[in-house]
Amino acid sequence: MGLRFLGRGLLLVPGYLYPVMQLMADQDMLILDDRKSGDLQSASDRQWHLVTDGVMGGVSDGRLAPGEMAGRPCLHLQGEVRLENNGGFIQAALDVPDTVLAGITGYTGVSLEVYGNGEQYNLHLRTRDLWLPWQSYRMTFRATPQWQTLRLPFAGFEPYRTGRALDVGRLKRIGIVAIGRAFNADLCIGKVGLFR
């Protein structure tokens, strides 16, 4: 017996029942976070966390908190990206639970609702195949000062400092990153999921 979706919010894995994710009615979207928690907890039962270049001696300053933008709940990533000491990033990171990987077949990319300040940001994917902290698969997007839904196909992600092809079935972490140049980051993140 294989994986089956039993309706809204339930995934049947042989021997287990996981209330780990919500599916939209059309089942074309697997929701990782819908921002209904009011805190840093995601809909996929993992906490969002802030990662900055301080882990490598950088001095960028970042904040990550639940918030609201234009009447919608969001995760608010703010801060100053600075380049001193070989730094240059702040990141909202979400680890992907194994229960999501069990049902990932057939999904073709990441859907992201964002409201920004007109700056460019990156979406980074890390898999279990990457061991070095700077390795990832990356795609750049511009976040305009209005809510928009971005659909970023897995096929468009570029490997960064790795020769391995992206294996989505080994996805470990999703990172929404302000990176690479000195600027003020101000990004609201709404619903995050995978699309077919």
Segments (PLM) and residue ranges:
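Beta-rich carbohydrate-recognition modules and glycan-binding surfaces
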Residues: M1-R196
